[in-house]
Amino acid sequence: GYSISAGQRKLTRFLLNYHFNAQDIWWLRTKGMSEEFCEYLRTYQWKGDMYALPEGTVAYPHVQMVRIECDLVGAILIETYLLQTMNFHSLIATKATRVTGLNTHTPRSVMEFGTRRAQGESAGNDGAYAAVLGGCVGTANCLAEMKFGAEVKAVGTVAHSFIEFFPTEFDAFKAFADTYPDSVSLLLDTYNIMESGLPNLIKLDDYLIEKYPNDPNRRVKSARIDSGDLARGSKRLRKALDAAGKPYIKLVASNGLDEKKIANMELYEHAHFDSYGVGENLITSASDPVFGGVYKLVAVKQPDGGYTPKMKCSDSASKAIIPGKKMPWRLYDENGQAQCDLIAMDDEVIEAGKPVTMVNLDSDAIERTVTITPTKVKKLLVPHVLNGQLAIELPSIAEKKAYIAKQLTQETWESELRLECPHKHYVNMTPAVAECRSKMYAELHGGKV
């Protein structure tokens, strides 16, 4: 399996502006915080370093998404925000790549429709951003476009309530078209799709042709159905619209969709939809609603500049944290596909064209130690914040979308991308990391990993 690492943009901006205001200090005093500590926080600014995967990087278990280097107080203060931000953004961006078909190399047009089912305002806005990163063409959340810009485009159709308000369905359609003649997108299932919605759609488009005969842009752009047998409805509508000389009107489906329902309609029912609106199953990632990223202390810097590794143990050796200040690398074969990820100590250098000996993280692996010669290697963590200052030019959303698509189509094994029983990506350790982990686990917990 795979995930998409996201949230770096928001986390970076948070760290650059991290401080306590007067109201924060007042409230902390009411909770018994010492005057000395409150005074310390009054002038506190986060001055640490943040190394992270570039936003949109394909990520795997055990491989760090973010590495924080700062004072202990700063590391503790940002923990909850870091986890909330990275976990939620990564969850939705990953789900979006599945819904939009990027993982199966069959991209489809999907709009994010889930704001009303999101767990709160921030989830609605951040989820829209992450969904667009993962391949969605836009969102029904207008506030998201206002916050993030035109790359998170606000899209959608009219509501059932709008149509119900008017004396007739055609009156509603006409009112909308007269107000927004350049972006007429209608909803057909308020009353009866074939007996009412379709005839009124054709009537409205004929009205626009008569009103704007020399402006082909002022036509009905699309029509959505939100109930009933979607696949059957799409075929009936497509046939009727083509027969009426209106093949340019696109069909949109919504109503409890996810990647599996869409795939079933396309593969087995031959549905004729041009686009999909996906709501709660995307904005909540209903099939896998939790992204379990953790944030652990792995090393403490000493006065001489060296680092003492630290480790949180577990009765399950596989859950034991990998200690030490580390740097993950990605190793590629001659075809440009990622062979594996390699967790190395920060001062270790991995070189392309030279044999690399690795220890498999899976203790049950038949071959615990393997050696490969990668054609290309890439150090995965890049500095985003250094000494509290921005250290990277944050790419545009379009650049990040293209980056995600390139990885999924050119660099990731198809077997890792499938929905059912995906192949497990190889994540290995250098011998130095493996030895440090095994030695510390034996000392602290009395066993071996």
Language model feature labels by segment:
Residues 13-16, 52-55, 59:
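An N-terminal, globular interaction/scaffold subdomain
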Residues 1-29:
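Intrinsically disordered, low-complexity, positively charged segments
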Residues 25-27, 94-98, 114, 416-422:
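Short coil/turn segments at secondary-structure boundaries
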Residues 2-5, 239-244, 249, 257-449:
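Gly/Ser/Thr/Ala-enriched C-terminal appendages of enzymes
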Residues 48, 53-54, 252:
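A structural connector/turn signal
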